[in-house]
Each structure stands twice: as structure tokens, then as C-alpha cells.
Amino acid sequence: MPIAMVMAEASARHGVEILCIGTELLLGNILNSNARWLAEELAALGLPHYRQTVVGDNVERLKESVLEAVDRSRILITTGGLGPTPDDLTTETLAAAFDTPLEERPELWFEIQAKLTAGGSISAISNRKQALFPRGAEILPNPSGTAPGMIWCPRPGFTVLTFPGVPSEMKQMWSQTAVPWLRQHGGLADIFVSRLLRFTGIAESTLAEEVADLLEQGNPTVAPYAGLGEVKLRITARGATVEQARQLLDPVDAALRHRTGLFCYGSDDESLASVVLDLLRQRGETVVVAESCTGGGVGAALAAVPRASEVFLGGVIAYSNAIKQALLGISTDLLHQHGAVSDPVVRAMAEGARQRLGADWSIAVSGVAGPGGGTHAKPVGLVHIAVAGPHGCDASPVQFGVRRGRLAIQELSVVRSLDQLRRLLLDGS
């Protein structure tokens, strides 16, 4: 039966189900980021998504999960289990569940061998199973790997889309092949346009109060998502055309930005670091870092952005007092009088880095990340941040709290320091 006809009969079932396959996921050895990413993508497309399941590399339990999905969902999306090893069982289990023979796709096997050869690997006989698919399945090409997926309608009203477990491969296949297919066959009568606004320095509850009326409206919808150091609002508009959907979305976007001011730092794939670097690039200015408790986290965030070298010159990880003295010029008296975690020292770190490394701006961070090392006067979670620029130095202490843990305190310090520089740049300092 043609795929389009099968999807037309899908009204008996509801929604999309995600099935993530892999014992490493079940045991918690690997974070299941695929399910979260796919859920956001489905929401952006306007496809109802009601269930997520994780199952290990076990034929019977995988088969049971698939057959359960048949009765309640019209689309099943699977990730994982498409590799060449014996515990990669997805394709053959799906075929067995619906009593459908596997057929080799010779052109696909040739392509897999070519990819392995180009990558300096020798194709093994085990890789040949990656060219086996149930009769009638449509191939989902994998541009980056040797594990293609498929779109298959084994029963009327039920479609399976399979993807490899490698997130980068799955995302590329989803965007290039699956989304166009879903728009054509997935029952999407309307076009959905989505935009993600990013906020920092404001709590989710406070943000929700500021935009409460917009959160309650129907089209576009506005949904909040909280993360470490930031809050996101996803705006999703529905229209007969892309242009119509954007006409609905843009005024809500503008209203949200107007109400929240500097708390909104960017949208979609923008990061705080990329926004800061763009602002510096527009001004023709440079930045360096001097880090203690963050251990290079601020520099790493900046260096992760393409073209960062145009404005990010480098930095110093001054963890010990001796390094602070030798590389940043911090005086012994200042350290003895105030301690490394203090306003005077972090200011001196920022000014020392800016002058010695020859940049327009510098960020300095010093704090108590824990779990030990805190005192009554300087508890775990206390972080001093300073940003030095052409017209002076702006410094402030932040108390992130002992309960957050070391890594969270470090990450929050990175976010806060980048945001401090962003605000100064926008202020015209």
C-alpha cells in the first residue's frame, strides 16, 4: 500500500511515539538527548507526541514495545540499534514483528563499503546487515555515517521511522529527509513556524509572570523551558503558509523582547558566547579572560564559537596565588589582605589580564566552587566576577548557593560573566 494512502488511514491512532533503543540508555550510562531533541522538534512541527519509551538491546522486549505502539500511535520514531554489531537489533526485530522478509539493497551495500574505505576502514561482513531492510521500506539516507534508517508502513495507519543513535547523524537525517516527509504525509494540514527566544539573569517564574497573557494564548503558543543559567521561550505559530505563520509569530516575538529587555540575549541557535563575540566584532574590539574557579570555562565557551579568534585573544587560568602573582601581577599584599576570592583581587585580575595581554576587554572570575574550601565569610557558591574595559572595571559578587554542586557553580559563573560583559557592551561602555 502506498505510504500516502497508509497515512490517510491513520485517524484510528493518535500521535507520535518515540522509542529509544540501547542498553546503555537503560542503564543511564549515556544521557538520552535524542528523545528530548525529537520531542522539541515534534512540538515545533505541531505533531502530537504522547509517549517515550526506552528499551535495552533485547529482541523480545524490543518487539513487545513495537507491537504495543501499533495499537496507540500512528507514527513510531526509533533511535539506536542500526549498527553492524550483534546487539544492533532494530531493523531485524521490526521485520520479524510484522512477519516481513528482509531484503538486501545492493546499491546501499556498495555505498556503505565506499564510506568505510574513504574513512580508512576495511568493510567487515557485519556491516552488510546495514544494507538489509524490510520489503517495502523507504530508505532514510545517512550522509554522515554507515547506518541508514527507513520509513516503513508495516500496517495501515502505522508508520515507523528509524534513526541511528548517534545524535549528529540522527539530527541531520531528521532535518534533511524526515521533516519534508512528515510535512507531506504526516497529516500536517497547516504549516508550523517556531522560534526559540533565550533569556538569562531572570528566573522562570518571574519571566512567566511578565508574559503571563502571552503564555495563555492559542496561536501562536508560547512555552517556557528552564535550563541551568537560562530560560527559553518557544513561540510556535500555525498558518496555511509559512508567510502567514510568520506574520502571527513576529508580533509576539517583538512583544516578548520589549517586555523583557536585556534579559533576552538571543534566539534559536545563538549562545551567550556567540552574542558577546558578535557585539565585540561589531565594535572592532577584543577580549581576554583571567579565570580561577571556572578553570578555563569562560575561554572554552568563547573558543567554541566559529571565528572566535577574530576577537578572543586568549587568557590565563590562574588557579594558584603564585600564578596570579606571576602572570597577572597581583600583589602579595593584596592577596594576603583580602584573599583570592574577593572584590579587590578579581578587579586586579581583570585589569592585569587586560593590560598584559593587550585587549580592549577582560573577564575575571574567582570563587569557591566547592564542595570544600568554604568559610562563614566566604561560603561555597560565592563567586566574584569582574569585567574590565576601556572606561573602567565593573565587578560584582554572586552567591550561587552550596546546594548546586561544583560543576553547576562553575557553569553558572561562566554564564554570569559572559552576560556581565554583554550588558556592558550593549550599554555603550
UniProtKB/Swiss-Prot annotation:
InterPro entries per the UniProt record, alphabetical? CinA, CinA-like_C, CinA_C, CinA_KH, Competence-induced_CinA, MoaB/Mog-like_dom_sf, MoaB/Mog_dom
The protein's matches in Pfam families, at most eight in alphabetical order, are given as: CinA, CinA_KH, MoCF_biosynth
Top-rank taxon: Bacteria
Signal peptide segment: none
Similarity comment text for this entry: Belongs to the CinA family.
**What HAMAP family does the record tag this protein with?**
CinA_B
Full protein name: CinA-like protein
Q: Which organism is it from?
A: Prochlorococcus marinus (strain MIT 9313)
